[in-house]
Amino acid sequence: MKVYLVGGAVRDSLLNLPIKDRDWVIVGGTKEILLKKNFQQVGKDFPVFLHPETHEEYSLARKERKSGRGYTGFHTEFSSDVTLEEDLIRRDLTINAIAQDENGNYIDPFQGRKDLNLRLLRHVSESFTEDPLRILRTARFAANLMHLGFHIDKDTMILMCKMVKKNELLYLTKNRIWNETEKAFKTLNPHVYFQILHACKALNFIFPEIFFLYERRTFFSILFTNFYSISFLSIGLSKISTLTKDVSIRFSYLCQFLSEKIDFSSTKENYDDDSAKLVKKLCKRCNIPSHIEELAVLNTGFCVFLSSIHYQSSSNIIKMFSKIDAWRKPDRIYKLSFLCDFNLFYHQNKIDNSKLKTGFLKKCFFIIKDISVKKILNQGFKGYQIKNELNKLRVNKLKFWRMKKKCFFFKE
């Protein structure tokens, strides 16, 4: 029985990147042998075992035969006769099909180390086409390794296009799609993920709303040269990803481009309900976690309002705080404030940013968040009067602070 380190750990080690997880393949082993060594079996589709001390994953070498459609349509064989090369050939990319033995020697039958040096994402074999999830994985690897100069091999891209054309993507589950997309959003260049999906014609199947951004760029670039330019979106998504690792903020930034009512001269409250519903529909369809969905919907709905936050009345700002339930969920304010600041100072040709201060939305909330209801109750207010009086106190306190700090750009 021989044990080999495989996959991402070998790849990342060769690239001098931090190793997140170490996965192992066992050749010549059996389920019975591992259980006797106190390994814990997990996984339903094929035997994966957790090491009794390190809890790292060990898999029996296996080979696969296509038996149906989609990523689940496989017959898997994991007998002790399966060779290491038979296990490696079923993997997606050559850079993920490198093994290392206990002495540090590399087993690399598909030239993965050469492709690492060439900065090339290349499929291992024609069996790449048997699993549609590999389209998303390859796009995600392109995003994850872009800063190192990696690109997708042209023949691999041709295979990806053929897979899309055969409607293989229809067999992917919502959770699988989001899991890969979330990983892509955690990379340094998440925009590359969407660019690759668009290039291989997969974006329309998976995210038709985002696909529309690419398709409408020609018309809207005439009206909104910077904001609706897809290159502007990509650069912005890349830039904001250098400032925060929060997936909900990165995703919300992308979704705001779905708003069709962006107008940097507007001073109305103007909640964009249609665009907010579009984002909500996207999130529901893809089973996107609720905390990410909520921020994306709010940021898109209030995109117009937030783009002119310094010019809004104190009354309208308080109304917005109430609508987003800021009193019970203050974390929303901090994230929306981050997005607001980024948008205002990134769109420098739209607003005279020399007049504006960062963190304005957050400061407004901080000024009025601790106004107590007890004082209002002690004054004898009842029922609906309590809410009205509390709102009045908040508005007046915010007005006073803004006058003192000269944070008005219009007459209230």
From Swiss-Prot:
Question: Which SUPFAM superfamilies does the protein's record reference?
Answer: Nucleotidyltransferase, Poly A polymerase C-terminal region-like
Q: Which reaction does it catalyse?
A: a tRNA precursor + 2 CTP + ATP = a tRNA with a 3' CCA end + 3 diphosphate; a tRNA with a 3' CCA end + 2 CTP + ATP = a tRNA with a 3' CCACCA end + 3 diphosphate
What are the record keywords, sorted?
Answer: ATP-binding, Magnesium, Metal-binding, Nucleotide-binding, Nucleotidyltransferase, RNA repair, RNA-binding, Transferase, tRNA processing
A Pfam family of the record is PolyA_pol
Keyword Ribosomal protein found: no
Domain of life, per UniProt, equals Bacteria
GO-annotated biological processes: RNA repair; tRNA 3'-terminal CCA addition
**Does the record bear Chloroplast in its keywords?**
no
List its EC numbers.
2.7.7.72
**Binding-site positions, CTP:** 8, 11, 91, 137, 140
- Please report which protein family the annotation says this sequence is part of: Belongs to the tRNA nucleotidyltransferase/poly(A) polymerase family. Bacterial CCA-adding enzyme type 2 subfamily.
HAMAP family assigned to the protein according to its UniProt record, in alphabetical order = CCA_bact_type2 (MF_01262)
Recorded hits in NCBIfam families, A to Z, give: PRK13298.1 (NF009813)
Q: What is this protein called?
A: CCA-adding enzyme
Q: Which gene encodes it?
A: cca
